[in-house]
Design a protein with these regions (language model features):
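Glycan-recognition and catalytic cores of secretory/periplasmic carbohydrate-active enzymes
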Residues: 1-403
C-alpha cells in the first residue's frame, strides 16, 4: 500500500506502530529525493514515488488538501488491517502463487505478529529489486519505477494488487481527516521537490492544489488558521504554520519560478516577523503578539517529530535573503542565529534543521541568474523553469533566479 508507519516497536524493524502520519511521510519523501538526487540510486526514487502514491490515494482530499494520517486499528485490533495468515494468501492468490508469495515476503504458518504475518523483506536478498518494481494496481507512478519490472515483477505486482483489494474489502482504516497548515506545508515541499528531481509534473500539481486549498480555506482576514475539517477552519495560526507555509511557497517558487509564490512567501514571512519575532533578544515566539494574552510567551527551538518553527523560520529568512538580496531579511536572520547559537551548541542533535540552515549561511553559496527578454512567452519560461528546477533542488549551496 505504500507509506511509512510511525516507528518500529522492535529491534529487528519488523513490527511497526501501524499508524501512518502525514508529516513523517513528508520528511521521508524529502530525504529519499535528496538521496536519489545525490546518488542516482534507483531504489531511493522508487520509495519516494510509492510514498507519494500512498498519499495521493489515501490521504488527499477531493479539493487537494492532505489529511493527517491513518489509525493503527481496524475493528478495534491494532495492525489487523496489515497482517495475513498463510491460508488467506493462498485463498486469494491460489496454491502455487500463494506459496511463492509467502516465501518471498516471510509469511509463515506460525506468523510473526500475534499468530499472523506482517509481509516483509528482512530475509530476502532481492529486497532492492523488489522495492524498485512499480505497482500493478492500475495507478500511474512516476518515471523512476514505471515500466522497470520484468515478467516476474509484473506477476508479483498483480498479486500485491489483489491482496491490496482483499485487504480493503476485509477492513478499512479510520482516517484523521483534519487538514493542518503546517503538516500540509511539509507535504507541499515534498511534492514540489519530487516533481523537480524526478521530472514528474503530477507531483508538482499535488503541491499546487494543496497550496490552493490552504489559500482558499485556511486564510481568514489575512491571517492563517491552524486546521480545517468539515467546512470549518479554526485556531489562530502559530509560528509553525507561518514558517512552514512560507517555506512551502518558497519551495514552489524554486521549482516553478513563478514570482507570485515568492511574493506570497515574503508577505507571510513579514507577518511572521511582525507577530512572532522578539526584536530585542532574537528568536520567534510560539504565539502571535495580537493573539491570546498569556502569562508567558514561550519560544521553542528544539526539533521534535518535525523541525522547530524557529529553525524553519531561519531557513525562510535565509532563502529570502539569498533570492531578494534585501538587507531587512539578512538583519533578522543574523539576530535569529545569535539567538539559536547557544541552543545549537549545547544540544546539536536536537537542532539539526537549524544547523543545516547555518551550514547554508556559513559555507560559500553560488547564484545562477537566468534572464529572459520581456517578450518571452509563458511556455518558454515554463520549459526553462523545468530544466532548472532539478538543479535548484539537488545542487547544494546554489540559488537559481529567473529574471
Amino acid at each position: 500500500g505504500g507509506g511509512f508507519s510511525r516507528y518500529s516497536t522492535d529491534g529487528q524493524w519488523l513490527v511497526p506502530h501501524f499508524e501512518k502520519m502525514l508529516y513523517d511521510n513528508s520528511l521521508l519523501v524529502m530525504a529519499y529525493i535528496k538521496a536519489y538526487g545525490s546518488t542516482g540510486r534507483k531504489m531511493y526514487g522508487c520509495v519516494a514515488e510509492k510514498i507519494l502514491e500512498y498519499v495521493r490515494r489515501e490521504l488527499t482530499d477531493s479539493q487537494g488538501g492532505f489529511y493527517c494520517g491513518q489509525d493503527a486499528d481496524s475493528d478495534g485490533v491494532e495492525g489487523k488491517y496489515y497482517v495475513f495468515t498463510r491460508e488467506e494468501i493462498r485463498e486469494v492468490l491460489g496454491e502455487k502463487a500463494g506459496r511463492d508469495f509467502c516465501r518471498q515476503y516471510g509469511i509463515t504458518g506460525h506468523g510473526n505478529f500475534e499468530g499472523r504475518s506482517i509481509p516483509n523483506l528482512l530475509e530476502n536478498d532481492n529486497y532492492e529489486e523488489i522495492c524498485e518494481e512499480p505497482w500493478g494496481n492500475g495507478d500511474h507512478g512516476g518515471n523512476i519505477c514505471h515500466g522497470s519490472c520484468d515478467t516476474i515483477g509484473g506477476r508479483e505486482n498483480e498479486e500485491c494488487r489483489r491482496l491490496y483489494q482483499y485487504r480493503i474489502d476485509r477492513a478499512r482504516l479510520h482516517k484523521d481527516d483534519k487538514i493542518l497548515v503546517s503538516w500540509n506545508s511539509w507535504m507541499i515541499c515534498a511534492c514540489a521537490m519530487a516533481g523537480a528531481v524526478l521530472g514528474e509534473e503530477q507531483y508538482v500539481d499535488m503541491a499546487v492544489r494543496a497550496d490552493a486549498f490552504i489559500k482558499s480555506h485556511l486564510v481568514k482576514e489575512g491571517r492563517l488558521m491552524v486546521r480545517y475539517r468539515d467546512g470549518d477552519a479554526a485556531g489562530e495560526g502559530k509560528l509553525d504554520d507561518y514558517a512552514c507555509y512560507s517555506l512551502a511557497l518558497l519551495e514552489l517558487y524554486r521549482v516553478t519560478f513563478r514570482v507570485d509564490y515568492l511574493k506570497r512567501a515574503a508577505a507571510w514571512a513579514e507577518i511572521m516577523t511582525e507577530q512572532f519575532f522578539d526584536r530585542e533578544r532574537g528568536g520567534f515566539y510560539l504565539y502571535a503578539k495580537d493573539g491570546e494574552q498569556l502569562i508567558v510567551r514561550t519560544k521553542e527551538t528544539y526539533d521534535g517529530a518535525m523541525p522547530s518553527g524557529n529553525s524553519v523560520a531561519a531557513q525562510v529568512l535565509y532563502r529570502l535573503t539569498r533570492i531578494t538580496g534585501d538587507v531587512i531579511w539578512q538583519k533578522v536572520l543574523e539576530k535569529q542565529f545569535c539567538y539559536l547559537a547557544g541552543a545549537m551548541d549545547g544540544y546539536p542533535s536536537g537542532h539539526s534543521y537549524g544547523l543545516l540552515t547555518m551550514m547554508d549561511v556559513l559555507y560559500p553559496a553560488k547564484e545562477l541568474v537566468c534572464t529572459l527578454s520581456s517578450g518571452s512567452d509563458t511556455e518558454r519560461r515554463r520549459k526553462l523553469a523545468a530544466q532548472l528546477a532539478n538543479l535548484a533542488v539537488t545542487a547544494e549551496g546554489l540559488t537559481v533566479v529567473i529574471k
